[in-house]
Amino acid sequence: MGKTIGIDLGTTNSCVAVLDGGKARVIENGEGDRTTPSVVAFTDDGEILVGSPAKRQAVTNPNKTLFAIKRLIGRRFQDEEVQRDIGIMPYKIVKADNGDAWVEIDGDKKAPPQISAEVLKKMKKTAEEFLGEKVTDAVITVPAYFNDAQRQATKDAGKIAGLNVKRIINEPTAAALAYGMDKKSGDNVIAVYDLGGGTFDISIIEIDEVEGEHTFEVLATNGDTHLGGEDFDNRLINYLVEQFQKDQGMDLRKDPLAMQRLKEAAEKAKIELSSAQQTEVNLPYITADNAGPKHMAIKVTRAKLESLVEDLIKKSLEPLKQALADADLSVSDIQDIIMVGGQTRMPKVQAAVTDFFGKEPRRDVNPDEAVAVGAAVQAGVLQGDVKDVLLLDVCPLSLGIETMGGVMTKLIEKNTTIPTKESQTFSTAEDNQSAVTIHVIQGERKRAGDNKSLGQFNLEGIRAAARGVPQIEVTFDIDADGILHVSAKDKDTGKEQKITIKASSGLDESEVDKMVKDAEAHAEEDKKFEEMVQARNQADGLVHATRNQLKEVGDALSQEDKDAIEKACEELEQASKDGDKEAIDAKSQALMEASQKLMEAAQQQQAQQGAEGAAGGEQQSSKADDDVVDAEFEEVKDDDKK
């Protein structure tokens, strides 16, 4: 049975870990890094780049370099957060036929799960190279506050990447697992403050320890799926754009190339200001006008950055208060605070959390790796390799149906431990009603229309009767991934209708299957591309070695033979440029055949040099022997030594 890997699919960076000898190990990618940028780029020649190679070329290819795609996953195009991102992102965000937010590359529309699948494929390959075996099973993490549509879209991304997603778990819960594995005794109530690249979560988790077995029970969770490091970056970018406009009278927002350079510089400056009090954003030749090139050189202090993002930090404290209230706990009940996500390295964020809880957060959990480590632990639990851990997660938002008067009637309250199943009996609103529409919604508002619509279906064939007489049992069943299954049953006729909520947006099964096939086709293309590169490299090496031999022993050949070899070299070079692997192989073979006499001449020369070397060595040896004088030894008795 193959290993199950744990993947933290992040907004900014992703990470993969596996249980190795009972301990979770973070795996380095092909570039030697423990985290991989969640960046996917499409080049002009059709190549797909993922991770650092994609990030490095972003400045020269801003419209086709996709980052922070997690902010779009499972979202509708008209969502306020998506509309806000459209004005910031250099790539094109478009409305799909089903109303989802997709991206467009060279006129080709792509769903966010397709893009996330490229990052997951990279994680899968990283794990396979380390383990030396094929990997198909994975546990993938999502923000605790992800709704049903976002969780389903993440599962779709895993399927497109060729992974069997055994479990979707919440990021703060995963971080708690990573932390709890080292804490071997006693009960504990912890708060996990997770501020990542694009999402924010707070979870209150109780860890109970009984005879070495740990139960992780999530008491409450809250958050904002559109608050993270990207928003902090954007505040700094806007400030720099405004300062430049004041100084130079030019708006950089109209120049995608300049904005991409500015994004990189802002991210770097933000990171530097976590350890320094001041930094300078220095971008020569950022743009140009009729008067010539323009340069940016703007000093930014830590205090300035803090003032730009102060409201974002405050915004993260509201869910903390709500989560504590939902868990029926006070600040003094929290024994430990874990901070997860790269943005928690900012001193002002750490200070705000310290002030809120009245104690310092723990520093021994790596904020970039903890979530992947926890996912690997959960993978070990599912595989049976970890016996003493039980994870009890919760659904982040209330679930219910729309009832008469446009009211939301809740069947499952938020922060209910999952998996769970709840049933409630409803009736008809009118006399002789033969069908009912079950409209499934998620959220905390009383008015159904103010909540997130997850989908709807009809139960037909209800027997004619006065209003209020038919009995329709609606059942909500949430699985361990937090994905909802709904059924409605007419108790009188026994007729039943079931759906797995895919949200009114989302990808249907046929779309996912098509994307899986596309991904498999790409895998074949990638393999061919690798083989082509290998063939080209071998061809270049062969041409280089042949020409070197021509220089060294070419005099031993006739001019006709030399011309034939040079012609074969040129033909192989041309085949290499044309990029036809079969032609490269054929021309390589032709060059080897044409060079037969050249190789023989080279071997003869080597043999001659070897023979001359050996003869010279013997001569030296005999001369050396003539100069040797036999030594005369005299035995010295012990008595003579004294």
Curated annotation (Swiss-Prot):
Q: Which Pfam family, just one, is annotated for this protein?
A: HSP70
GO molecular function terms here?
ATP binding; ATP-dependent protein folding chaperone; unfolded protein binding
Give positions of region: Disordered. 570-642
Give the Low complexity compositional bias ranges.
600-620
Per the record, where are the segments of Basic and acidic residues compositional bias? 570-585
What upregulates or represses it? By stress conditions e.g. heat shock.
Enumerate the UniProt keywords alphabetically. ATP-binding, Chaperone, Nucleotide-binding, Phosphoprotein, Stress response
Q: Which residues carry this modification: Phosphothreonine?
A: T199
Compositionally skewed regions (Acidic residues) per UniProt: 627-642
In the record, the note on similarity to other proteins reads: Belongs to the heat shock protein 70 family.
Task: Describe the task this protein carries out.
Answer: Acts as a chaperone.
What is the protein name stated in its UniProt record? Chaperone protein DnaK
